[in-house]
Amino acid sequence: MNKVSFLTLGCKVNQYETEAMQELFKKRGYEICNENDICDVYVINTCTVTNLSDRKSRQFISRAKKLNKDAILAVVGCYSQVAPDEISAIEDVDVIIGTKNRARIVELCEESKKSNLKFNIVSELTKDCGFDVLSIENQESKTRAYIKIQEGCNMFCTYCIIPYARGPIKSRPIDDIYEEAVKLANNGYKEVIITGIHVGSYGLDLGNDTRLIDVIEKLSTIENLDRIRLSSIEAGIISKDFLIRLKNCKKVCEHFHLSLQSGCDKILKLMNRRYTTDMYRKKVRMIKEIFPNVALTTDIIVGFPGENDEDFQETLNFVKEIGFSKIHVFKYSKRKGTPAFDFKEQVDGNVKKFRSNELILLAKDMTTEFLKKELSEKHEVLFEENINGNRLVGYTRNYIRFSAPYNEDMKNKVVYCNGISVEGEEIFGLASKIKI
């Protein structure tokens, strides 16, 4: 039996696409192995969000061929898309695929092995490319599964290379999304997480009225699916109508990852984020009015070019006002090929580090406060992971990591639980009743 291993860099979308490519290899009889095993094929699914990501991609490309000099080495993904010539210059690479045509990966790897030829099928991404369908029936996690519903982004934030790596928005047909979700539910998955590059733009390219909310409403009709969770969305999609329709879909989780990036209007404008803090504030109020028990998580970039101490303080103040349950903090990293790369007033590295540490400390305090507030609530927990044989860990509907004493009967079940204590960034508690 031929063996293949995958190494994946980057986001949840990349992880989804890796698992989809793994299924393609499995269907051709390949054994999926560890990245450090001796294999016949190595696939590096690359990331290009920062220059560091590019460097890591090159390092892993170099390492893979050293494991087996006779293996086929395929490099796919975002770095391949934006820098195919750089990858072509690496002698050991046999197959180069960008962010489309990944369904051909098995065919190209086998043809390369047979003919001793190299293949580079990276081509320009246009709005006419269509959605590159990669679907999954089984994922590594047996409780929660990702479903990719769209590709690409038209927003062009000044710090972001992704619109160039992923191309214009391309929406997956709604019936295809539904069919994949049905298969996942039939295979025992209790929760699906809707993901994509810019999820809120779903449907804008279809030439009809189908939008993200229509996808959610259709998935909510799947009888043996208990939960639907949204990945990252933007403030612009939030409206009263959208939220009311979400609320009526009883399976939608009370958790919104609402990307912020900065709490300073000056910086938001420099980033080309297309909203103000006042608009964001109003959207949050709408959410909390309709989903009182909601968890709000976000991303923030510190040290963006032009950000001074007063601007950063505005971000700190705004973060406190909103009351996030969790914040992912990133230090701005220059990315060649983006407008911000050439911006003046680049922030010193030590200043970025200081601001990052300060925001991380604030974020930890906010997470603790949120968890303490949630201790008195009764939670539905989908248990999925066994920790050291004595605890099960899972997530509540509002995305709190929750642990309880191990009980085999609760694994991959939704269980009503009561919290006892806050332990770091999770709640420990006891089960009261299995829901499903």
Task: Describe each region flagged by the PLM.
Residues 1-202, 256, 278-289, 313, ...:
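Proteins enriched for Cys/Gly/acidic motifs involved in redox and nucleic-acid/cofactor modification
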Residues 53-55, 168-175, 203-209, 270-273, ...:
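Short, solvent-exposed loop/turn segments at secondary-structure boundaries
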Residues 73-74, 82-83, 87, 186-309, ...:
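Conserved SAM/AdoMet-binding glycine-rich loop
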Residues 91-93, 112-115, 210-212, 246-247, ...:
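Short, hinge-like loop/turn segments at secondary-structure boundaries
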